[in-house]
Amino acid sequence: MIDRYKHQQLQIGSVSPQQISAWANKILPNGEIVGEVTKPYTFHYKTNKPEKDGLFCERIFGPIKSGICACGNYRVIGAEKEDPKFCEQCGVEFIDSRIRRYQMGYIKLACPVTHVWYLKRLPSYIANLLDKPLKELEGLVYCDFSFARPIAKKPTFLRLRGLFEYEIQSWKYSIPLFFTTQGFDTFRNREISTGAGAIREQLADLDLRIVIDNSSVEWKDLGDEGSTGNEWEDRKIGRRKDFLVRRMELAKHFIRTNVEPERMVLCLLPVLPPELRPIIQIDGGKLMSSDINELYRRVIYRNNTLTDLLKTSRSTPGELVMCQEKLVQEAVDTLLDNGIRGQPMRDGHNKVYKSFSDVIEGKEGRFRETLLGKRVDYSGRSVIVVGPSLSLHRCGLPREIAIELFQTFVIRGLIRQHLASNIGIAKSKIREKEPIVWEILQEVMQGHPVLLNRAPTLHRLGIQAFQPVLVEGRAICLHPLVCKGFNADFDGDQMAVHVPLSLEAQAEARLLMFSHMNLLSPAIGDPISVPTQDMLIGLYVLTMGNRRGIFVNRYNPCNRRNYQNKTVDNNNYKHTKEKKPYFLSSYDALGAYQQKRINLHSPLWLRWRLDQRVIGSREVPIEVQYESLGTYQEIYGHYLIVRSVKKEILCIYIRTTVGHISFYREIEESVQGFCRAYSYGT
């Protein structure tokens, strides 16, 4: 459908019978209305032409060949002549054959049929609205029992029998035996109700606003009662309150969308266009047909049988009519969702038929494979890997992908700079991978964002914009902080990259879709750009330090047992003899690490600014080391204090590693950058 802003969109919901007939009905020049499929046939076995009023009828769904009717007559499509648009003999419209991809038909059901999605899928919408158990409604739909109509102060057959509303199940087989078809119809229309028609009547009698009011009052009453002291009763009340909330939300949805609840019961069954359920002839003259055709045939056969029982047969017992209505209901259930009621229907080769639900759901369904999974131009796909040196808003594109995505822009750049006289020469330069090509590609990519998408796109953050940079290799590099929004990890996941072409799309990508603009979850507002998986492991490795500690002696808890037992191996003895380095600043420590004088986890002493928390601490030093000049060092668990002869604090050293220093500096620079940006903004 197309809305008032001329946006194409797809809307899924229940449809009225009038809308279904409007989709299919066509009026011929002689006044005949076509659109109803009444015969279960497909093609004639001799002529290989579609059967009239069948599942592939050309009058209903359009011609197989453009501009050629079933008689073989030809008309020019779109010619402004006074020739009739319909063939006078066969009634086929002279139109493009592509109409068979969207022209629908319908089957007029002899009895109402419930839509199995609304009845059997959990939660059951019909059971929620009617506030009745699902098992009871199933028995009513499949004609296992009936209920009495409320007829006040009138003599009825049921009153003579002394029956009440839910006692008719025992009369399931006895009541229909007393009546022929006409008599049973009269009795049923007046006194009892069964099948999907009973559900339709109850849904039509519902006042949704009264349903909301009654449910709200009951919910408040249950809330005012408080706890009963019985755990089982409290759970029962809690489940009832949850049910009432779902019922109110469902009723509000029907009111908001202006949908009548009785639409959940079908009177007209839509028939899909023939091109969506084709019959194909393969080698050897054999035919391959879609399973949906066989399921439609099953529905039409049973529906026609029920129509004959109701119209032509005068002596058919009412029990047979009820059984046939049940068969029609089961056939429609199988068409919509095969196997939802138990054992699925199978063909002669014991293969399960693919119903309408099987066609549209899943990874290979109509939506995900055909509609959402289309191949588009200016797009690529590759495996994602970690880009540790990337900023949050950047992604690394392999040269092979980037040159293909931005090839047209590079060609334009080569021609504008007079490096190529035409498109052919520009393409040859790109194929030869000349150095000037990569320079122009860099210029093009600087001002052009790209979109990264990871399927399935379940929420808004499944597609985000990034500033691309060229990287070596064949994998897309990604900052690990954006993985949570994509629900991605680096174990072989693939992502698609798209190039926004129009200026509007590029502006939208920059203003709304850049990764650094989507730091919070749109659903709950919590931070979504948080360290996960690989990044947490990296932070752990960076800050785990050395288990031996800065002192390998009796003061270290890790080695106290070894000291007591006097069993120190050679490796520990070597560390004991090593003197731990002292550094005046973090720059000196990082420089020593880059020169490979120390390791990432090597313990060291780093001079630190005077901290009042350290100065005022009451912690007892582990060891005190005196020097020849009178100064001494008080060694604690995680720091040491250098004091003068007069016991004044000269300086403080903390025990740390290069990994801790790197982590601290990254956080410090980030906080300072945020503060500067905030001060500029204010």
From Swiss-Prot:
Entry protein name: DNA-directed RNA polymerase subunit beta'
Catalytic activity from the UniProt record: RNA(n) + a ribonucleoside 5'-triphosphate = RNA(n+1) + diphosphate
Gene Ontology CC annotation, any one: DNA-directed RNA polymerase complex
UniProt GO MF annotations: DNA binding; DNA-directed RNA polymerase activity; magnesium ion binding; zinc ion binding
Subunit text: In plastids the minimal PEP RNA polymerase catalytic core is composed of four subunits: alpha, beta, beta', and beta''. When a (nuclear-encoded) sigma factor is associated with the core the holoenzyme is formed, which can initiate transcription.
Protein localization: Plastid, Chloroplast
HAMAP family: RNApol_bact_RpoC1
Family to which this protein belongs: Belongs to the RNA polymerase beta' chain family. RpoC1 subfamily.
Cofactor: Mg(2+); Zn(2+)
Positions that bind Zn(2+): 69, 71, 87, 90
Annotated EC: 2.7.7.6
Co-factor: note: Binds 1 Mg(2+) ion per subunit.
Keyword Chloroplast: yes
Enzyme class: transferase
Organism: Acorus calamus var. americanus (American sweet flag)
InterPro entries: DNA-dir_RpoC_beta_prime (IPR045867), RNA_pol_asu (IPR000722), RNA_pol_N (IPR006592), RNA_pol_Rpb1_1 (IPR007080), RNA_pol_Rpb1_3_sf (IPR042102), RNA_pol_Rpb1_clamp_domain (IPR044893), RNApol_RpoC1 (IPR034678)
Domain of life where this protein originates: Eukaryota
Residues reported in the UniProt entry to bind Mg(2+): 489, 491, 493
Biological role: DNA-dependent RNA polymerase catalyzes the transcription of DNA into RNA using the four ribonucleoside triphosphates as substrates.
Keywords: Chloroplast, DNA-directed RNA polymerase, Magnesium, Metal-binding, Nucleotidyltransferase, Plastid, Transcription, Transferase, Zinc
GO biological process: DNA-templated transcription
